[in-house]
Amino acid sequence: VSGQEPPKAIAAAMKAADVVIVPTAQSLTHTNARIEAAKAGTRVATMPGITKEMFSRGAMTADYNEVEKLTAKVTEMLTRASRARIEKDGYVLNINISGRNGVPSPGVYREAGKCGNLPSGEAYIAPLEDGSDGEMIIDGSMVGIGKLESPLHMTISGGKLRSVTGEKSENLDILLKNEINGTVCELGIGTNEAAILNGIILEDEKVYGTVHIAFGTNTSFGGTNKAECH
């Protein structure tokens, strides 16, 4: 499951390295292992779900100087904002982001301790853990399912996922296992104009103009929720 810690030997090796490339099936981006490696000065590029084809098309082919500029602008907007509102097909989800700082993931990691996805291109923020209420439709893709043929419907109150229905929603049972796993932990906006929706969340959440939310752990980017997943 994305967000679970790697073996201690792997965590130690990450911390001792100068640069770490992480082409894994599940994401290590929001783990203590990645956080501690960054504190030690390691540059880390996480690539969960990366495929050979993704190296030659889509998000990886973007002009990353432009991605970096746009990501910085959207990050500033998130930091300045106090609330976000997602509307789709008559459903509304209100998200409290007051007092939290936006985080850029431009796919450019030149300095010691810089980390993020590759390919990348998103600005994201940790909402207040009890500050999301409403309903939303997901019509792009979902971790554990892939590219959606039909939408998912989610009901959220007090920052927690209360129900999810739709295509293969049973694959998301870990989010309903407890309130910690089901906490809305991230709001993100895609900033990569070359990214393609393909069912692999690594690239899907980077598609320019899309918005995504995540559930679970957010302690690595300004939140307070530590869960079994992200």
What are these regions (language model features)?
Residues 36-39, 100-102, 152-155, 170-171, ...:
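Short, solvent-exposed amphipathic alpha-helical segments in soluble enzyme
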Residues 81, 133, 151, 184, ...:
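Short, surface-exposed beta-edge/turn micro-motifs
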Residues 103, 144-146, 169, 192-197, ...:
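Residues in flexible loops and secondary-structure boundaries
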Residues 148-151, 166-177, 201-202, 225-227:
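Composition- and surface-driven signal marking solvent-exposed, interaction-prone regions
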Residues 157-195:
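A beta-strand-loop signature enriched in Asp, Gly, Thr, and Trp
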Residues 181-230:
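Cysteine/selenocysteine-centered motifs that mediate thiol-based redox chemistry or coordinate metal-sulfur cofactors
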